[in-house]
């Protein structure tokens, strides 16, 4: 049993062979599906990687502009504008909604930002001076937050896809290099054992047939000998009967001769 460690420990029967063939077919189909899934995820992963790179570049430019804008606001207002902004906020103008996107069976969380144009709690902020700079900073920071939300969504998807792709590739490699070869070796082992059993069965049936033929030939030979003995006994009986008949006939002829002699003596 060479290579017994590279196959499953099963009893070689035709039922087991059918089970192993079904398992091999399932493994091949699973390998094909996982391979396509890995390719689809890898394609999406590369797209997300490119988008993350673009978003980071955009984020750098936006945050630089926002920093200059905030400096302009502080220069124009001349006081602590952040305190006024915090006191002016009554309702959330900027909201973030989360949803899930299905990519080849993998659910990726995505974040969408929404701006409620009906809410404007900063219209009276810095009304005395610096109002224009405040509105400009508000727009720039709104774009910065949108970019941050987009970047957070992309990076979350990046982390999840990276882990899922690694797991999928490990499964693909395990099926390709372990499960399928082991199942094929098991099928080859079962086929070899079944062929060996078929040859043994054929040899056994051949021997049984030869024994039957020898027994039939011996029976025919015994029957022929018995028949020959019976025929020989019949011939001996017939010869003996013929001999006895000849003896009786000879005795009768001798008696007749003696009687004739006696008749001649009387005359």
Curated annotation (Swiss-Prot):
It is a peripheral membrane protein. The keyword Transcription does not apply. Keywords: Hydrogen ion transport, Ion transport, Membrane, Transport, Vacuole. GO terms for molecular function: proton-transporting ATPase activity, rotational mechanism. The keyword Transport applies. It is found in: Vacuole membrane. GO terms for cellular component: fungal-type vacuole membrane; membrane raft; vacuolar proton-transporting V-type ATPase complex; vacuolar proton-transporting V-type ATPase, V1 domain. Signal peptide: none annotated. GO terms for biological process: vacuolar acidification. V-ATPase is a heteromultimeric enzyme composed of a peripheral catalytic V1 complex (components A to H) attached to an integral membrane V0 proton pore complex (components: a, c, c', c'', d, e, f and VOA1). Belongs to the V-ATPase D subunit family. Subunit of the V1 complex of vacuolar(H+)-ATPase (V-ATPase), a multisubunit enzyme composed of a peripheral complex (V1) that hydrolyzes ATP and a membrane integral complex (V0) that translocates protons. V-ATPase is responsible for acidifying and maintaining the pH of intracellular compartments. This is V-type proton ATPase subunit D. The gene is VMA8.
């Amino acid at each position: 049993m060479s290579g017994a460690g590279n196959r499953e420990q099963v009893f070689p029967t035709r039922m087991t062979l059918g089970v192993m063939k079904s398992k091999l077919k399932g493994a091949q189909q699973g390998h094909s599906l996982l391979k396509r899934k890995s390719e689809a995820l890898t394609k999406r992963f590369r797209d997300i990687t490119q988008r993350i790179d673009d978003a980071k570049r955009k984020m750098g430019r936006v945050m630089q502009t926002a920093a200059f804008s905030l400096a302009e606001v502080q220069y124009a207002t001349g006081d602590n504008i952040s305190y006024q902004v915090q006191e002016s906020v009554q309702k959330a103008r900027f909201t973030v909604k989360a949803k899930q996107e299905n990519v080849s069976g993998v659910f990726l969380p995505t974040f969408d930002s929404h701006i409620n144009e009906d809410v404007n709690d900063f219209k009276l902020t810095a009304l005395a001076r610096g109002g224009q700079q405040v509105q400009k900073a508000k727009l720039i920071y709104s774009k910065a937050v949108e970019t941050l939300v987009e970047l957070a969504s992309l990076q979350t998807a990046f982390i999840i896809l990276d882990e899922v792709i690694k797991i999928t590739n490990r499964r693909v490699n395990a099926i390709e290099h372990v499960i399928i070869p082991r199942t094929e070796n098991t099928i080859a082992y079962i086929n070899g054992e079944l062929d060996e059993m078929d040859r043994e069965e054929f040899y056994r049936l051949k021997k049984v047939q030869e024994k039957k033929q020898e027994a039939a030939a011996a029976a025919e030979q015994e029957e022929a000998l018995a028949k020959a003995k019976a025929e020989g006994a019949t011939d001996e009986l017939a010869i003996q009967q013929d001999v006895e008949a000849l003896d009786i006939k000879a005795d009768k002829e001798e008696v007749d001769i003696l009687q004739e002699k006696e008749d001649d003596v009387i005359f």
